[in-house]
Amino acid sequence: MTNDALIAALSHLVSEGRNPDTMDIDLLPSLDIVQRINQQDKLVPLAVEKVLPEIAQAVDKITDAFKVGGRLIYMGAGTSGRLGVLDASECPPTFGVSDKMVIGLIAGGPEAILKAKEGAEDSPQLGEQDLKAIDFSSNDVLVGIAASGRTPYVIGGLEYANTIGATTVALSCNPDSPIADIADIAISPVVGPEALTGSTRLKSGTAQKLVLNMLTTASMIRLGKSYQNLMVDVKATNNKLVARAARIVMQATECTKEEATEVLKQTNYEVKLAILMILTDLDIESARQHLHHQDGFLRKAVESHKSN
């Protein structure tokens, strides 16, 4: 695409428009600047609310993929790519899953996480290559993330995913975007022009983060990774998380800190197993088998034991 054509294309994007509420932002003192930005930020959850049905549809597809050993792959450039990497990296400690289950790909590779490599997004071939490098398959789900909805790297990835029969999801902050047109599911929270024209790390980035949070959190809940609203598959990999594990057991069972700590040590800090042992008085092996029979769903394991 020529420079003139690119300028013309960008001029039609909502995310590249000038915001009439911040035209004088360069004249304002600090408090007024951040108040203007905050006023714009308040619009983000309202935009996300309008696309909840599409988000839920994507959650169902992701959950189905996980159940057959598939993966969730995020793909984006710049801020969009970093947000995908961030959400993916939080899944292992939060939900106790493999770091291969949710993967974030960013145009330009790992170096682009810390230092912008803006030109890397211009190659659709790179998107396809990055997916092939991780053995992307039809069992996986690809979420292409691009605030503009027209990033070549993401388009290339989505097109390749379509050719092999994988489920594709487009996350954009512009209506009727190119990536929305080629994906199975289009999630398009339109947040309007940014406080600083074209700086899509602002409202657009916030909207993307909210959506990604929902995709992984809701999918993991559907897989039994929570009990009530507690993170019962959390991995106690540092002192803070060891303390959190004990607190979760105490909250779920109303036991003492001493009992929670004792049982957690027996289970090698498997929170879900510790809770089941305390609530049912089962020994560790019986509790493990009972949990396995309920596909890892702690609530089902507790209730089925009570009914016997």
Swiss-Prot record:
Belongs to the GCKR-like family. MurNAc-6-P etherase subfamily. It comes from Vibrio parahaemolyticus serotype O3:K6 (strain RIMD 2210633). It catalyses: N-acetyl-D-muramate 6-phosphate + H2O = N-acetyl-D-glucosamine 6-phosphate + (R)-lactate. A lyase-type mechanism (elimination/hydration) is suggested for the cleavage of the lactyl ether bond of MurNAc 6-phosphate, with the formation of an alpha,beta-unsaturated aldehyde intermediate with (E)-stereochemistry, followed by the syn addition of water to give product. GO terms for biological process: 1,6-anhydro-N-acetyl-beta-muramic acid catabolic process; amino sugar catabolic process; N-acetylmuramic acid catabolic process; peptidoglycan turnover. It is an enzyme of class 4 (lyase). Residues 62-225 form the SIS domain. Transmembrane segments: none annotated. The gene is murQ1. Keywords: Carbohydrate metabolism, Lyase. Homodimer. PANTHER family: GLUCOKINASE REGULATORY PROTEIN, N-ACETYLMURAMIC ACID 6-PHOSPHATE ETHERASE. Pathway: Amino-sugar metabolism; 1,6-anhydro-N-acetylmuramate degradation; Amino-sugar metabolism; N-acetylmuramate degradation; Cell wall biogenesis; peptidoglycan recycling. The active site is at E90, E121. GO terms for molecular function: carbohydrate derivative binding; carbon-oxygen lyase activity; ether hydrolase activity. This is N-acetylmuramic acid 6-phosphate etherase 1. It holds the Pfam family GKRP-like_C. PROSITE patterns: GCKR (PS01272), SIS (PS51464). Its EC number is 4.2.1.126. Coiled coil: none annotated. It comes from the Bacteria. Specifically catalyzes the cleavage of the D-lactyl ether substituent of MurNAc 6-phosphate, producing GlcNAc 6-phosphate and D-lactate. Together with AnmK, is also required for the utilization of anhydro-N-acetylmuramic acid (anhMurNAc) either imported from the medium or derived from its own cell wall murein, and thus plays a role in cell wall recycling. Disulfide bonds: none annotated.
